[in-house]
């Protein structure tokens, strides 16, 4: 919380983390995605992107604890919840050195070093901001464990994904489904579309106005709470505490 002083009072105001300067920087980076430009604009990155993102991560610790004590908001500069702006170009033809978005990943404490683990995710990009959660591209044993849980507990899956508080806020990701039924499941299974998922994620769109509003911490915390039933189901399927 920020504060202002009125005669005889100290008034707490919601903190504003990001400004439109975040999106201005990222748009310009997309047009000038090279090391000399980034080096010349390093302080803008620090001021508009990294410092406010780390401040948000630090302040998310308490509301995240209210959702689950098994996920972490880690504000470390290296190895924490904020993804590096530098791209990994080792296995791609796209050699541009920088990402043109900011990403925050609040992972399960049992799998903190794994980007393919259950997590909350916040994506900030000009014209494409969203909050997401779930499990992205899990290894085959994890994916199979989730499919087995969906088939064994269809009512719990429906409660987690198709009812409030989840369903008014989130939409399940479409992803790139399997072409055929996964091993062990019949072609006429009533939940075949869900069983064929490669990713078990959900997302909700955010406007830039919401991201730059003073109440964004509370706004995003409410979004995390709405997604809790979905993450709870995934964690139980993987024998992870929630």
Give short role names for the model-derived ranges:
Residues 9, 14-28, 57, 61-64, ...:
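Long, solvent-exposed, polar/charged low-complexity segments
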Residues 86-151:
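Aromatic- and glycine-enriched beta-alpha-beta binding-site module
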Residues 45, 49, 53, 143-146, ...:
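Amphipathic alpha-helical coiled-coil segments
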Residues 24-25, 41-44, 107, 118, ...:
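Short, hydrophobic/aromatic alpha-helical segments in well-folded domains
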Residues 70, 75-109, 113-115, 159-177:
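Soluble extramembrane domains of integral membrane proteins
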Residues 38, 126-127, 204-205:
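Residues forming anionic-ligand binding surfaces in small-molecule and nucleic-acid pockets
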Residues 27-85:
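Active-site acidic/histidine clusters and adjacent loop/turn architecture
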Residues 1-11:
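N-terminal amphipathic/basic-hydrophobic helices that include classical n-h-c signal peptides
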């Amino acid at each position: 919380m920020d504060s202002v002083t009125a005669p005889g009072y100290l008034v707490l105001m919601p903190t504003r983390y990001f400004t439109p300067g975040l999106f201005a920087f990222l748009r310009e980076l997309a047009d000038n995605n090279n090391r000399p430009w980034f080096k010349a604009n390093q302080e803008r990155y620090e001021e508009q992107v990294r410092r406010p993102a780390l401040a948000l991560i630090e302040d998310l610790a308490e509301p995240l604890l209210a959702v689950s004590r098994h996920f972490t908001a880690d504000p470390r500069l290296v190895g924490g919840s904020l993804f590096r702006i530098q791209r990994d170009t080792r296995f791609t033809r796209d050699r541009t050195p920088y990402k043109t978005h900011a990403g925050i990943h609040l992972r399960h404490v049992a799998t903190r070093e794994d980007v393919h683990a259950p997590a909350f995710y916040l994506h900030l990009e000009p014209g494409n901001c969203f909050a997401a959660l779930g499990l992205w591209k899990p290894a085959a044993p994890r994916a199979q464990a989730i499919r087995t849980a969906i088939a064994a507990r269809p009512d719990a899956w429906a409660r987690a994904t198709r009812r409030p508080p989840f369903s008014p806020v989130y939409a399940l990701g479409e992803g790139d489904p399997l072409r055929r039924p996964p091993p062990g499941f019949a072609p006429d299974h009533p939940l075949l579309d869900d069983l064929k998922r490669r990713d078990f994620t959900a997302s909700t769109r955010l406007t830039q106005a919401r991201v730059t509003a003073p109440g964004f911490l509370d706004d995003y915390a409410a979004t995390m709470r709405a997604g809790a039933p979905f993450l709870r189901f995934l964690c139980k399927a993987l024998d992870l505490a929630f």
